């Protein structure tokens, strides 16, 4: 059933109908369309379009339809309705007859779809926050279990300074915490109800839009009808958050792939998140992490597509805006799947503590400690930096670590070096000295873990 047609003397060509119809993807808004319709029916009672009895009859029928949708949402796809709004109205008329035709009074599909997608996005934000928080909890638990796992920290993918695997985990806790808070901010901004804005100029019925907004779970009604039906900021914002969070997930996945490589051998991924080769029997591939990394471009592509769609649109609604749904549906589904998969990767992750420690002892990652040691002996830092650089070159030529050099060897470069140098060159000393807030010292990492556990409890 089309919601329009009186203006036309010819039926739409099937090719155009197939091109124009959106039910194949906007069926996902069925529950929200029904919820919005129930709210609108109550608003129509207050302006004497519906009687109380008629509203009760409509609400009962809509609730019955809601149960049917929840039991088998895919059944909607068997229909040839133009969109989800047409489908809901058609099914309502099947249940209550001509009374169902009164429900659209004062309402446009423009404000109808605007409220539907906002209701859907609000619900997805809640679900996404639950998934992100669950990932954070798993990272914190992994951190708690790996506080003694010393490993190299990297800059430019070169060994830089010793850290712990726990400190690495907690870095991602912070990244995902920002993603979580961005979702909260986005939720607050989208928590305004556009229903009652009509096609663009507002509704001709004196609907109490603030009451309607509260009935539908919004904080308040939107302030401008033209903006209300044109606004897709919340979709762009969620796509932006999803893209940034996917970038965080991709970095997590890339680290895991590197750590899992035969050259590093820092971690072993579970058989349950890896796959093999059809040719090479020995292979155990980190496919879960590679797919997270690969899907990141897909989500970012949805953001780019949406921005390009909106950038040239005049006010108010244009059919281009129908293109908002497939991108946001796919991007948020992909994001949530990747968050959940990253959580699964952590479930049975094994950290090779001996191997990480062995790697941390290589690469002269204690060179900064030697520079700080010279500073403590009165050498200006810029001079100590140069001295240590020369010392490292010497150690490389001799095939030694800094901690393996003798005092006479050290004193070729600085006379201030004494026997106390060896203590500060140990891995434990390297960690312990980084004791400012946010540092890698075991004490600070333990505090960060405890604080996060309390926050996420």
UniProtKB/Swiss-Prot annotation:
Family annotation (InterPro entries): Arg_succ_lyase_C (IPR029419), Argininosuccinate_lyase (IPR009049), Fumarase/histidase_N (IPR024083), Fumarate_lyase_CS (IPR020557), Fumarate_lyase_fam (IPR000362), Fumarate_lyase_N (IPR022761), L-Aspartase-like (IPR008948)
Pathway(s) served: Amino-acid biosynthesis; L-arginine biosynthesis; L-arginine from L-ornithine and carbamoyl phosphate: step 3/3
MF GO annotations: argininosuccinate lyase activity
Any one GO BP annotation for this protein: L-arginine biosynthetic process
Assigned GO CC terms: cytosol
Subcellular location: Cytoplasm
SUPFAM superfamilies the record matches: L-aspartase-like
Top enzyme class: lyase
Entry keyword set: Amino-acid biosynthesis, Arginine biosynthesis, Cytoplasm, Lyase
Domain of life: Bacteria
Reactions that this protein is recorded to catalyse: 2-(N(omega)-L-arginino)succinate = fumarate + L-arginine
Annotated EC: 4.3.2.1
Ranges in a coiled coil: none
Entry similarity comment: Belongs to the lyase 1 family. Argininosuccinate lyase subfamily.
HAMAP family per UniProt: Arg_succ_lyase (MF_00006)
Xref: PANTHER family: ARGININOSUCCINATE LYASE (PTHR43814:SF1)
Name by which UniProt lists this protein: Argininosuccinate lyase
Organism: Haemophilus influenzae (strain PittGG)
Record lineage: Bacteria, Pseudomonadati, Pseudomonadota, Gammaproteobacteria, Pasteurellales
